[in-house]
A protein has these predicted regions:
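Short, glycine/polar-rich helix-capping loops at beta-to-alpha or helix-loop-helix junctions
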Residues: 5, 28, 46-51, 159-162, ...
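Catalytic alpha/beta core of large soluble enzyme barrels
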Residues: 288-290
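Alpha-helical scaffold elements adjacent to nucleotide-binding pockets in ATP/GTP-utilizing enzyme cores
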Residues: 5-9, 34, 53, 75-79, ...
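Thiamine diphosphate
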Residues: 59-76, 82-286
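Mobile "lid/hinge" segments at catalytic clefts and subdomain interfaces of large enzymes
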Residues: 11-45, 51-53, 221, 255
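Active-site flanking residues adjacent to catalytic metal/cofactor-binding acidic residues
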Residues: 1, 21-22, 89, 285
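A short alpha/beta connector and helix-capping loop motif
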Residues: 2-21, 102, 197, 221-224
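Hydrophobic alpha-helical bundles that form the membrane domains of multi-pass transporters
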Residues: 19, 36, 47, 57-64, ...
Length: 290
């Protein structure tokens, strides 16, 4: 993606760019992809492993073993602050450090609604339909009935309701590509082209990242993959970088794409069942927001 493109060109620029890699051994859930194996090799060798992804790209490199130690960070940054070439500062940290609940359940505490800091319990409970839960139950049933059904996420398994136990239950039929929405859509298109039944779940706000693949890979080829668009609403995420209402103008203008908008659980499940069963179109479903 764009971050890799920037890293690739940084060495050629040769300027005093300091690139900080906060390595807490996790994405939102667990990490996926070949790069993370090399990060582990670097951690295990205290940064001395000869196989070094960053050096292979022409970047200088230093390693900080305890990135939660403020003094160690000060020393590392003091060492590199006036350097005259690009350098990577690889920092080994613990996600949720200092808060027991977050240390014990890193995935849940990546993002939380307001909670009691003493107990970790949410301050507000929602009685509305949980469409992530509904989705997971439906897809697990479908995957058991048909080995061609594959559930795909790009680093956000919780949006589909796939807890660690459910991911384990689904086995190879659940695929997490990491935070790589472009690849997720291209993968879904390829699976559909070869007779599979891919279902890719993604937050509305991340649709823009995959627009090229939606148009070029999926819809031009008219491959019958299913795209579940979550939190397409004005009241969901309200950060300016995570607004969730651009999916309709983005998706609805792509030829061959069928975009559905159910209003209740019954309509949603009927549309999801149909979209998996049919073989004529790529289908997106705007999942009702709770």
């Amino acid at each position: 993606g764009e971050a890799f493109e920037g890293l690739d060109y940084a060495a050629e620029l040769g300027t005093n760019m300091i690139i900080i890699v906060n390595d807490n051994q996790m994405s939102i859930a667990e990490n996926h992809g070949g790069l993370y194996r090399n990060l582990k090799e670097l951690r295990d060798s205290n940064g001395q492993c000869e196989c070094n992804f960053f050096k292979a790209m022409g970047l200088d490199y230093i390693y900080v073993n305890d990135g939660n130690d403020v003094q160690a960070l000060i020393e590392a940054f003091s060492k590199v602050k006036d350097i005259q070439h690009p350098i990577v500062v690889h920092i080994n940290t613990l996600k949720g450090k200092g808060y027991a609940c977050a240390e014990q359940d890193k995935e849940t505490y990546h993002w939380r609604t307001p909670f009691n800091p003493e107990t970790g319990e949410a301050k507000v409970s929602y009685e509305e339909e949980d469409y992530s839960e509904v989705t997971a139950q439906c897809l697990l049933k479908k995957m058991k009935e048909d080995s061609r059904v594959v559930t795909i996420t790009s680093g956000t398994p919780a949006v589909l309701g796939f807890t660690p136990d459910r991911r384990k239950e689904a086995g190879k039929q659940f695929v997490d590509v990491g935070i790589a929405e472009e690849h997720a859509v291209a993968l879904a298109s390829g699976i559909a082209a070869n007779g599979g039944k891919p279902v890719y779940g993604v937050y509305s706000t991340f649709i823009q990242r995959s627009y090229d693949q939606l148009s070029q890979d999926l819809c031009i080829n008219n491959n019958p993959a299913v795209l579940l668009v979550f939190w397409g609403t004005l009241s969901g995420m309200n950060d300016v970088t995570h607004l969730c209402f651009f999916d309709i103008p983005l998706i609805s203008n792509i030829p061959n794409m069928v975009y559905l908008a159910p209003t209740c659980k019954e309509e949603y499940l009927a549309m999801l069942e149909w979209s998996i069963r049919q073989n004529e179109y790529p289908v997106a479903i705007r999942v009702p927001a709770t």
